[in-house]
UniProtKB/Swiss-Prot annotation:
It is found in: Nucleus. The lineage of its organism: Eukaryota, Fungi, Dikarya, Basidiomycota, Agaricomycotina. Pfam families: PAS_13 (PF24990), Zn_clus (PF00172). Keywords: Activator, DNA-binding, Gluconeogenesis, Metal-binding, Nucleus, Transcription, Transcription regulation, Zinc. GO terms for cellular component: nucleus. Residues 1-71, 161-198 are annotated as: Disordered. It comes from the Eukaryota. GO terms for biological process: cellular response to starvation; gluconeogenesis. This is Transcription activator of gluconeogenesis ERT1. Transcription factor which regulates nonfermentable carbon utilization. Activator of gluconeogenetic genes.
Length: 393
């Protein structure tokens, strides 16, 4: 029994020894396989081990390499394509444009320009179009004080077929276009409100404004007329409502006008009269009855549609110290001053909508829907009010 027990561990250790030796012998083989697998590299001569890759010849570029031209032709330059030095180039020959193959225009850098070239501005290029009259040129006789504005008006005139020709009559075959009347009455030297609509548009009208306005406009006269006018038309309650509305914005106006010098007020009046010129153009293009007046209510601009709606003549309203509230019914006057007081110093981009009853010269009422917007001057004072009406049928 003792001999058997002593031999049993030897019998059990034999397999472990053999397995360990086999594992030790197998480990170098596995490591050698891993090392050989990681060290496998692609041949440097470009050939592969497979038969398919060895059978294919290497790819080569067909033909000589294209050389970039020093200067592309006009068509290749416009298409942003590579050109060659030959004229005509191969691309133009293939496309059948060999006769028009010319050198492209290369813009010169500013530091390479001569003094004469810098002094001469490039004329604006206008492509010819058979739809428009051939007599159109970029130098149309418009005197708007701006080359860009002259060009735009010239293009519009050419589209409408009314390109101005100072030497001859207009084209009889062109459609006639109605233009807004331009009264030729000059400024009378006073900053009168009616003179704003009597100025011709453009740079000439602006120059007349700057020369004519020599003193500030007296707004107190308009409020004095209002105080005299109220007792003749309104009862005590309506007068009280209007006076309360005036008391809302009048102190703010006085406070903003206190630091202004006489030169500032003259400048504000010039800006006001200048804005009337531009507003007159807009009113002439609009078909809505429109009137513009000062913050005191004094009318300064009247559209022809408003005269057709109410029966008033333009000469009766402009230039005669006529006030807009004289054309309103009593209740409309009260509502207007209350709305003006609430929106005088608010956002000027919004309009105020209300109901209004206009009065004809005979006293006949004309019920309308009414909206007005308030424009401020450079000193942030409400200066110009633009009103529009639509009749209620």
């Amino acid at each position: 029994m003792s001999s058997a027990l002593t031999q049993q561990p030897a019998y059990r250790l034999a397999p472990s020894a053999s397995s360990s030796t086999s594992d030790i012998n197998a480990a170098p083989d596995a490591d050698s396989k891993k090392k050989t697998g990681t060290k496998r590299r692609r041949p440097q001569d470009g050939t592969s081990d497979s038969a398919d890759s060895s059978s294919q010849p290497p790819r080569t570029r067909e033909g000589p390499k294209k050389k970039k031209a020093n200067r592309a032709c006009f068509h290749c330059q416009k298409a942003h394509l590579t050109c060659d030095d030959s004229r005509p180039c191969q691309r133009c020959v293939k496309r059948g444009m060999a006769d028009n193959c010319t050198e492209g225009h290369r813009k010169k850098a500013k530091y390479l320009l001569d003094e004469e070239e810098l002094a001469q501005p490039d004329p604006p290029y206008v492509p010819p179009d058979p739809m428009f009259p051939s007599s159109y040129t970029a130098s149309a006789p418009f005197s708007l004080g701006s080359e860009g504005a002259n060009l735009e008006y010239s293009i519009l005139s050419a589209i409408l077929g009314n390109s101005p020709d100072p030497t001859g009559p207009p084209n009889s075959g062109s459609p006639s276009v109605s233009h807004a009347p331009q009264p030729s009455a000059p400024f009378n030297g006073q900053p009168d409100i009616g003179a704003g609509s009597a100025i011709s548009g453009g740079a000439q009208g602006a120059a007349a404004v700057y020369q004519a306005v020599t003193k500030p406009y007296d707004y107190t006269e308009g409020y004095h007329f209002l105080m005299k006018h109220l007792p003749t038309r309104f009862d005590k309650n309506d007068i009280l409502r209007i006076v309360r509305a005036l008391a809302i914005f009048r102190p703010s106006l006085i406070a903003l006008q206190m630091p202004l010098s006489e030169e500032d007020e003259v400048f504000v009046e010039k800006c006001f009269q200048r804005s009337l010129i531009e507003l007159d153009k807009l009113v002439s293009f609009s078909g809505t009855p429109t009137v513009a007046w000062r913050r005191t209510g004094e009318i300064c601009l009247v559209g022809p549609e408003f005269c057709m709606l109410t029966g008033w003549e333009k000469e009766e309203l402009v230039g005669r110290r006529k006030y807009i509230y004289e054309l309103f019914e009593n209740q409309s006057v009260v509502e207007y001053w209350e709305n003006f007081a609430n929106h005088a110093f608010e956002n000027t981009t919004q309009s105020v909508y209300s109901h209004c009853v206009l009065l004809k010269p005979s006293g006949t009422p004309v019920p309308c829907t009414f909206c007005f917007s308030i424009r401020r001057d450079i000193m942030d004072l409400p200066s110009l009010v633009i009103g529009q009406w639509l009749p209620l049928l």
